[in-house]
Amino acid sequence: MGRTLEDKKQIVAGLQENLSDTVMTIVIDYQGLTVAEITELRNKLRPAGAQCKITKNTLMRRAIKGDEKWEPLSDWLSDSSAFLLIKDDLGGAIKAYQAFQKATKKTELRGGVMDGQPLSKEDIKAIGDLPSQEVLVAQIAGAINSVTAKVAVGINEVPASLARALQAHSDSDKAA
């Protein structure tokens, strides 16, 4: 027994709701994955604020129809498609997928969309190579901290060097 029209409308509405909260969507070919492997992929993506949705291409096509932000996805809707919907940590989610793909060697990255722009495999890999948001924040904080430390040392050095100069002058007067 197939899905009713009402079921399909609910699925499309759910996909549209998920896409509204999504920053980036990646399309992969999941053919050959077992249910356990798909569950493993979902578990790896969850900490990065991403989810893996598997649905018929026709339903996804209806969900993105008329939405300029996601219409470029239609270029990759063929065969067995799984959709990685990334909401938060782009780099972390891509790295989680890449680790899964490296371990299973069963999926193929087709492409993705971010802010209405289609992304090639190379673009997605480049985003995955970027440091995570936490690492970038730590690097910026470290740079700011080192600047303030150098300024503090510089400010303290002026009176210290003056005191050393006065001490040296005083010592030279005592010696003479």
From Swiss-Prot:
Fetch the InterPro entries from UniProt: Ribosomal_uL10 (IPR001790), Ribosomal_uL10-like_sf (IPR043141), Ribosomal_uL10_bac (IPR022973), Ribosomal_uL10_bac_type (IPR047865), Ribosomal_uL10_CS_bac (IPR002363)
Cite a single Pfam family from the UniProt record. Answer: Ribosomal_L10
Q: Which GO terms describe its molecular function?
A: large ribosomal subunit rRNA binding; structural constituent of ribosome
Q: Gene3D superfamilies recorded for this chain?
A: 3.30.70.1730, 6.10.250.290
Keyword field contains Disulfide bond: no
Could you tell me the keywords of this UniProt record?
Answer: Ribonucleoprotein, Ribosomal protein, RNA-binding, rRNA-binding
An example of a Gene Ontology BP annotation on this entry?
Answer: translation
Q: Name one GO cellular component term.
A: large ribosomal subunit
Give the protein's biological function: Forms part of the ribosomal stalk, playing a central role in the interaction of the ribosome with GTP-bound translation factors.
Q: How does it assemble?
A: Part of the ribosomal stalk of the 50S ribosomal subunit. The N-terminus interacts with L11 and the large rRNA to form the base of the stalk. The C-terminus forms an elongated spine to which L12 dimers bind in a sequential fashion forming a multimeric L10(L12)X complex.
Q: Which family does it belong to?
A: Belongs to the universal ribosomal protein uL10 family.
Any idea what this protein is called? Large ribosomal subunit protein uL10
Species for this entry: Acaryochloris marina (strain MBIC 11017)
Q: Which gene encodes it?
A: rplJ
